[in-house]
Amino acid sequence: MKIFPTTSIKQLDADTIENEPIASIDLMERASRALARAIAERWEPDTPLTVFAGPGNNGGDALALARLLAGKGYRLEVYLFNTKGTLSPDCETNKERLADVPGVDFHEVTTQFVPPVLAADHVVIDGLFGSGLNKALSGGFAAVVKYINASPATVVSIDIPSGLMGEDNTYNVHTNIVRAHLTLSLQLPKLAFLFAENEPYVGEWQLLDIGLSEDVIHDMETDFCLLEHEDVSALLKPRSRFAHKGNFGRALLIAGSQGMAGASVLAARACLRSGVGLLTVHVPFCNNFIVQTSVPEAMTELDISDTCFAAATDTDDYQAVAIGPGLGKAAETEAALLEQIEICQTPMVVDADALNLLGEKRNYIGRLPKGSILTPHPKELERLVGKCQNSYERLMKARELAKSAGVHIILKGAYSAIVTPAGKCFFNPTGNPGMATGGSGDVLTGVVLALLAQGYEPEKAACLATYVHGLAGDVACKKQGAVGMTVGDIVACLPLAWKMLEE
């Protein structure tokens, strides 16, 4: 599913109007019908509704929605803010259509606003400003937003919470953004919905199909997409009836140190649960017995050190290498990592302590083998690119790093972003808070390693691994709830997640 920047959304509307063809007021009516259905599915007609409409097309949507809900038996109080005496043409039309509609108490605010009393059983419909906003709210509109946020009412925003910008909110005034409980987004999501710091404003979000042209959406370019099940499923390679283990790749996992054998075990188990043909785990002697007994399906290769990774190893016989889980940050480990990067010609998955060590030797990132994938969480990424103010800046810096170093990056989070050297960003919708526990990243590393070893292209491997990792977490959460989940549960659910993708 494509995610368009706000600069493209207006063009998307215009192209739909031209190509369908349909008048803009009729497209607004179609959107408002979808909004009315969504409201009616959640709230009964006896629910007190208060609508706040702005002077633009978002306000026009809100006025049309009020009329349609009144026709369904709802009673509404509607406030249209027209302090400058100028409404958009479609907003003006819907103001006229709302006149004398039974069940609507209409107020046009041109000067002083006398706020209504909003109780806990009220639902506020926020239609002040839409995705075209390009500066922070101030003055009277900021005061209205603060009044809404201070009320105990449930807040529903049309398309996007008023005051929130569609992408970059670095310089926004966050106290002047509506805090919605539900955002009804028209046709497609906004990039801002996928950033953690915007959750208090967006709340739950739901997509409403308003019939924008599928041909126009298909033809319009964007660097941002939200992964969908059917698209990820299509990435799976068929397995021949006559295949043998050699057809599914040889993988090398370099992991573990004193007291950190668990990371090796988790990554190895995930790799083996993701279709790899053969797996070797390079470990220090102190981890060898643990790995061999915990993961009997894997082979082990001993490092020269008893306690840590201290010597680079030959990778010519492998189709993919992963390095980092439980590796530690000993001085000899840093030296071995840098040497491993220099001699390795095989795509590498770089995670955890390997990323932390690279943060101190950033010039080595560009020396990673072609097809390599970095899997940082936000703090690990910042060690590579510097401090970031928010998720948007972090994503932009990840794109810059991917382009300059020629690597793929899986920036982990609630909506993990797969960033390509071409600047494309694929966001993953699967996963849940139960996965926010130690070792989850080690499991992801194992899955990515397995797919690279099987010959998947880096972009496809990263998208497929991230999606199935979250899907396995969702299966585990559904079985037992989020609170008691461990990463072992995620590994255990990987086979079912793969099966769900195959069906």
What are these regions (language model features)?
Residues 36-128, 136-158, 344:
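Nucleotide and nucleotide-moiety/phosphate-recognizing core
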Residues 99-105, 168-176, 312-315:
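Intrinsically disordered, low-complexity coil segments
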Residues 125, 129, 162, 354-356, ...:
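Short, glycine/acidic-enriched loop or turn micro-motifs at the edges of active sites
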